[in-house]
A protein has these predicted regions:
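Extreme N-terminal starter segment of soluble prokaryotic enzymes
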Residues: 1-5
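Short beta-strand-to-loop capping motifs
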Residues: 9, 56-62, 97-100
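Short, surface-exposed acidic-centric catalytic microdomains
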Residues: 20-64
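Flexible, gly/pro- and Lys/Arg-enriched active-site loops
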Residues: 43-50, 65-68, 72-168
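Active-site-adjacent loop and "lid" segments of alpha/beta metabolic enzymes
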Residues: 150, 189-206, 225-251, 256-264, ...
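N-terminal capping/lid subdomain adjacent to the active-site entrance of alpha/beta enzymes
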Residues: 163-208
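Catalytic domains of carbohydrate-active enzymes, especially glycoside hydrolases
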Residues: 205-221
């Protein structure tokens, strides 16, 4: 039987509690899907911490009563202590739907009565919002209304979609585009190779400057992926990036750090050193151990589309419909990650501008972000166009480091069309451009 379960927490490291609960649900059922994550105001007893809320869909052979008891055991094992009705809790698991069954049991082994569908569902925007992420067209067996219709009838303005971080922090995905600053500690990257790899101190100072300029995330890479670049060993990649991550954390830098790698061994070392996100240009395909690692650790991932490698990619830019094909690939890799145990709320997708795409194809991907998002079911979207060759081909600017204005145009269009994050070299200029854009939009 397919069952929808709501998850909520407002104590301690809320996202860790939700991730742990999802894994524990996976021990009593098969987790089929999970929603995005929402930061919400407490609805009934309002004088308490804000909640994080999500919904998952699982498949189970357990009866409704046995499934409820299993959920209550998870709550108890995770340290939930009864306080007062609608009060704070480490974890809360509510059964929303049990297939299309209607269930009403007065008492379940000393617990409150079991009512399915959940009797307060229709008034809870904090439940309907994440439920709509994964089942917008599901029909309530009693009211005959779809979830998206039910959501439209309640106020869910206070449900803020967020991107969780392992340390308990979070990034707001709704208010404005997030800026990821690029820190290449490589000798051969296409626009800044050899600039920041001379010493750990030099790289660390540049990261600090990008943070001061407005970077929300620092993305550290130790291998160039420009067309024609030679691959490096995992050991060399780790030698370049791990000391920088460690030094930033030792310096008290709390900004999220993303490690740009497709090697699980490098990713694991980076996570242990303090990395918050793994940015995998192969979407977990090049190293079969990558997605299981992220399912184990709960560290978020960026899944990017590419074809071939740095040597062969330019020959593989052949598509009938680049937007459809790239978006479908990102959706497919998302579904693979979900099956591996990575929650939807821990995933961002990247169309991979410049990776096996020509200028026309890159421009189409930016121009049709709306269609792209529709195909991926509104997965958070990262756009990484900074200083790339297609910008030079459109603008005539040959020197990559001088493509600031062309990059800015892509950034603004991406923000307008619905991307949540942009990866750039020129953080200060990007921050100023976005400040002006949002200043105008809010007037």
């Amino acid at each position: 039987m397919k069952v929808f379960v709501a998850l909520g927490s407002n104590l301690g490291n809320r996202q860790k509690h939700l991730f742990t609960a999802l894994k524990k649900l996976g021990s009593i059922a098969t987790v089929l899907d999970s929603s995005f994550l929402y930061d919400t105001k407490a609805m009934y007893e309002t004088d308490q911490n804000r909640f994080l809320n999500a919904v998952c869909r699982v498949e189970t052979d357990l009866s409704p009563t046995d499934f409820l008891l299993a959920c209550k055991k998870i709550e108890k094992d995770m340290g939930r202590v009864k306080t007062y009705r609608m009060g704070p809790r480490v974890i809360d698991l509510d059964i929303l739907f049990y297939g299309n069954d209607v269930v009403h049991i007065d008492k379940v082994e000393g617990l409150d009565n079991l009512v399915i569908p959940h009797e307060r569902l229709q008034e809870r925007g904090f439940v309907l919002k994440p439920l709509c992420d994964i089942a917008p067209d599901f029909i309530h067996p009693l009211t005959g209304k779809t979830i998206k219709d039910m959501l439209a009838s309640v106020n869910s303005d206070d449900c803020v979609r967020i991107f969780p971080l392992p340390d308990g922090g979070m990034l707001n995905l709704q208010d404005r585009m997030l800026i990821m600053g690029i820190l290449n500690v490589t000798p051969d990257s296409f626009s800044d190779g050899g600039k920041w790899n001379a010493s750990v101190e030099q790289a660390t100072e540049h990261a600090k400057q990008m943070i001061a300029d407005g970077a929300d995330i620092i993305d550290i890479g130790g291998e160039s992926t420009r067309p024609g670049a030679a691959a490096v060993t995992e050991e060399e990649e780790a030698r370049r990036v791990i000391p920088v991550i460690r030094r930033l954390r030792e310096a008290g830098i709390a900004v999220p750090i993303s490690v740009d790698t497709y090697h699980s061994k490098v990713a694991r070392q980076a996570i242990e050193a303090g990395a918050s996100i793994v940015n995998d240009i192969s979407a977990g395909e090049d190293d079969p151990a990558m997605l299981p690692l992220l399912a184990e650790t709960g560290v978020p991932v960026i899944l990017m589309h590419k074809r071939g490698n740095a040597v062969t990619m330019d020959k593989q830019a052949v598509y009938r419909d680049v937007v459809k094909e790239v978006a479908e690939y990102c959706l497919d890799r998302t579904e693979v990650a979900l099956r591996m145990g990575i929650p939807r709320w821990n995933i961002i997708v990247d169309p991979g501008l410049g990776f096996a795409k020509n200028t026309q194809q890159n421009c189409a991907l930016v121009n049709e972000i709306g269609r792209f998002n529709g195909i991926t079911k509104n997965m958070p979207l990262l756009i990484a166009a900074s200083r790339k060759r297609f910008i030079g081909e459109v603008t005539g600017v040959k020197n990559a480091a001088d493509r600031v204005m062309g990059t800015a145009a892509v950034t603004l269009l991406s923000a307008e069309k619905g991307a949540q994050m942009v990866r750039v070299h020129d953080v200060k200029q990007t921050k100023e451009i976005l400040d002006m854009y949002y200043g105008i939009c809010k007037e």
